[in-house]
């Protein structure tokens, strides 16, 4: 892989929490960092305070915004799909999709698909997932027959792992790796404090694990893995079900309008 100082790196959801800290550390190491958020003022502030090269504004609950975001990027070495939400009550995106699934999985599926041809090999795609995972119910992906906030979050995060594993298979032959990770358990972030309760780990732990996935030379050529922090780990069994992975891929293409 290229040195960090010779890379352009996009970190989604990087105006707060883990994403902001990762972006700041990458910028400190000399990377050309593209920070992203949905609030223009917070994006501008993050650029100033982290030394990022550019700020990009997009609401990931809107597929049109995701397309506009991708259209602003010419070349990329590393894509970090970090943005995520926990939604207390069932809500729908601008496109009519269940909001947690739309932001945590579908937006990143579309963004990654649109940026694949703009990745400068060797390249890395890092999907920030979670050890909290729930199997996908393909008969009710939009959770119309019952909604609970944490199971919805856990399903969306497992979707990211299925997506990672399937994309890793589809990119065989290209020098592009795709891995997913659980950065740390209940980090001390605003989202955790407001939605899940008392934090159990520091943001610094999550930053270290995420930076390893982004920059560790020992992971050159390593693809289709799930990491719990810095350790290899097993995801939910559904992540290794080829039929489930393909079914999610096909459904994601349909929902994102790229089928």
Predicted regions and their residues:
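N-terminal Rossmann-fold cofactor-binding loop
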Residues: 13-14, 36-41, 60
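Conserved Rossmann-fold cofactor-binding substructure of NAD(P)-dependent oxidoreductases
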Residues: 60-75
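Canonical Rossmann dinucleotide-binding motif of NAD(H)/NADP(H)-dependent dehydrogenases/reductases
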Residues: 2-35
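C-terminal helical subdomain
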Residues: 198-236, 240-246, 250, 254
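Conserved hydrophobic beta-strands of the Rossmann-like cofactor-binding core
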Residues: 8-11, 76-80, 125
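Catalytic loop of short-chain dehydrogenase/reductase
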Residues: 84-92, 97-98, 121-175, 182-197
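Rossmann-fold cofactor-recognition segment
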Residues: 50-64
